[in-house]
Amino acid sequence: MRDMRASSPETTSAVKCPFNKTAVEGTHNKDWWPNQLRVDLLHQHSNKSNPLGETFDYAKEFQKLDYAALKRDLHALMTDSQDWWPADFGHYGGLFIRMAWHSAGTYRIGDGRGGAGRGQQRFAPLNSWPDNVSLDKARRLLWPIKKKYGQQISWADLIVLAGNVALESMGFKTFGFAGGRVDTWEPDQDVYWGREMTWLGGDVRYGAVSEGVHHPDEHRGAKEKASKNSDSRVLENPLAAVQMGLIYVNPEGPDGCPDPLASARDIRETFARMAMNDEETVALIAGGHTFGKTHGAAPADNVGPEPEAGELEQQGLGWHNRFGSGKAGDTITSGLEVTWTKTPTQWSNDFFEHLFGYEWELTKSPAGAYQWVAKDAAATIPHAHDPSKKLLPMMLTSDLALRFDPVYEKISRHFHAHPDQFADAFARAWFKLTHRDMGPRVRYLGPEVPAEELIWQDPVPKVSHVLVDAQDLLALKHKISASGLGISQLVSTAWASASTFRGSDKRGGANGGRLCLAPQSQWEVNQPQQLSVVLETLRRVQAEFNAQAGDKRISLADLIVLAGGVGVEQAAKRAGIVLEVPFVPGRTDALQEQTDVSSFAPLEPFADGFRNYVKEGCVVPSEHLLIDRAQLLTLTAPEMTVLIGGLRVLGANVGGVKHGVFTDRLGTLSNDFFINLLDMGTEWAPVSKERHLFEGRDRRTGALKWTGTRVDLVFGSNSLLRALAEVYAAVDAQEKFVRDFVAAWSKVMHLDRFDLV
């Protein structure tokens, strides 16, 4: 047989691959239309990216975990220094604390996104942020343990637990640990990290105030500039970091200007945006900086590209360091070279001893970064890799903020004088930091879950009564139907209660009945006057039912959801379809004292396209805000679409406005919204140059037929959403529309029922 590899006169030219290019290299829709609506955000984290399959139950796997053995292995790892990445001071504790902190510290209360709950530090962009240099090594050090325990411990849980064990192995008593973080398998696309196009840029989030970190040769005047800028600048919402690629603040000071007071203002703003008060902020900074060190052995130009830009042979590791050995005493991360205490592997009060025990003068690290050295001090700080050397005490600009800001100073001096209270405050703040995005306590797993209930966990009372049965529900539905409340009142109230849920940090929802409490009862979007009428009526129904003998009761939280279902059933019946809206009792009513008003304030919607509501002054196009709201509600694009169509014809719009109510059968669960939106007999035009509101007129006569908002019209304009709208506008779609609406409605009503999982 002829060797097909042999050359011949006919095949002398080099063989070419017939597939020269792939879709990755081609021009994409986003390149042509950069402002295209991101409907794809509603289809993240599908089973197609999950190797464990849709039947995998992490909670069940976690229960099989030998938790004590896992912790023993983590304790052993802390002092098992590896030649490929030696431990500072012979202990990896500082590195693992930083890893856990930076995993959890991306959380922001504004939209609940970020945080440790999904193990996102493994993926871009977080795995390549400038603030996360060397954390790739920390995760590789954990890999043998992750490999050993497999799917019984998620990466998300392991990263946080490693930080906890690091603290414990250095003599600190933690507040506890809860498992339950479920890994995702691709980067979150819905998180807005900012619009800067350069690492460490801040020009957009502060309105062209900063362009990135700089290190001026002369810092004279830099303090005045930083102070002026930090006084006047406003950080863009919902961001909680001062520069692209940082977790919180620039440790050198605002824009690299070494001004402790200006740094304090940045610290207060960013920590508040992740729900930390001043005491928690001081405890976290001082507690975290009791351990370990920063690394700035040489200038940053010795460091190679981040993991996502690395070559194949680097195997996902980044920041290859060409200086010296590239590790140990030659390590470069932040560019700062600071060890805060004499006991970097042991819990102590040394941070405050040094903070107040010395005067400080400005200096630079070997990498050229601004830091502070103690005046007239002896070299008492251990070297991380040479026991024969001692170093001078050093601090960061952001550390000195705790001394020179008057509020932080008072707290710091109190902690200095009361180390037991400092330890307790740090333990609680650390637990809050690492568990803030986990939602209610019912999601917590493991033997170290603290018994104490904390207000930031949005507690709800346990069920202490006998739940209603099917016969009771029929009687209650009859009472609701006879109460005089209309379909729109029932539906809009239930939606207002349940739709506060955020899949990001698992907060909000109908359980707890907080719609009846401050601040939610007074939110503009919840129509306080109408709400008070509905709640008063439902309370009468509740009181009458609960007055019966025995222990059977219904909460107001349950009754609100049940009443919404009654409204949907009535509207479906008007459309000729008799069905039962799913309802599972078991919600309880929280008390006002169990509700942190300031913590709940960020849950207030400044836009809710499902109710055709946008707060005045909002500049983001409302259709984009609709996608954001739908994503927080964990809705798919079809679910979002059918809910919009249904809520419009049920009269759920805030204020009863007629925009988007494309029907003459208000209160009937019809598919009229889609039929009339897609009617080519209607011609649409904006009412004003702002293009917020549109009129739909008869193409022949010019007569006004409808008015609609951007949210309404996008279901006919956007090609993806129009394709979905066409399904529900078809002649044979009425029953499918109703049943799909009920399924999506029920999903939203039960999003926070983690007790049912």
From Swiss-Prot:
Location of cross-link Tryptophyl-tyrosyl-methioninium (Trp-Tyr) (with M-274): 101-248
Enzyme Commission number(s): 1.11.1.21
Position of the Tryptophyl-tyrosyl-methioninium (Tyr-Met) (with W-101) cross-link: 248-274
Known catalytic reactions: H2O2 + AH2 = A + 2 H2O; 2 H2O2 = O2 + 2 H2O
Swiss-Prot/TrEMBL keywords: Heme, Hydrogen peroxide, Iron, Metal-binding, Oxidoreductase, Peroxidase
Region of interest called Disordered, as start-end residue ranges on this chain: 213-232
SUPFAM superfamilies assigned to the protein according to its UniProt record, in alphabetical order: Heme-dependent peroxidases
Record GO cellular component, one term: cytosol
GO MF annotation terms: catalase activity; heme binding; metal ion binding
Cofactor note: Binds 1 heme b (iron(II)-protoporphyrin IX) group per dimer.
Site, Transition state stabilizer: residue positions: 98
Cofactors that this protein relies on: heme b
Post-translational modification: Formation of the three residue Trp-Tyr-Met cross-link is important for the catalase, but not the peroxidase activity of the enzyme.
Pfam families associated with the record: peroxidase
An annotated GO BP: cellular response to hydrogen peroxide
List of residues binding heme b: 289
Enzyme class: oxidoreductase
InterPro entries: Catalase_peroxidase, Haem_peroxidase, Haem_peroxidase_sf, Peroxidases_AS, Peroxidases_heam-ligand_BS
Sequence similarity: Belongs to the peroxidase family. Peroxidase/catalase subfamily.
Subunit structure as annotated in this protein's UniProt entry: Homodimer or homotetramer.
Main function: Bifunctional enzyme with both catalase and broad-spectrum peroxidase activity.
Cross-referenced NCBIfam families: cat_per_HPI (TIGR00198), PRK15061.1 (NF011635)
Protein's name in the database: Catalase-peroxidase
Organism the protein comes from: Xylella fastidiosa (strain Temecula1 / ATCC 700964)
Lineage per the UniProt record: Bacteria, Pseudomonadati, Pseudomonadota, Gammaproteobacteria, Lysobacterales
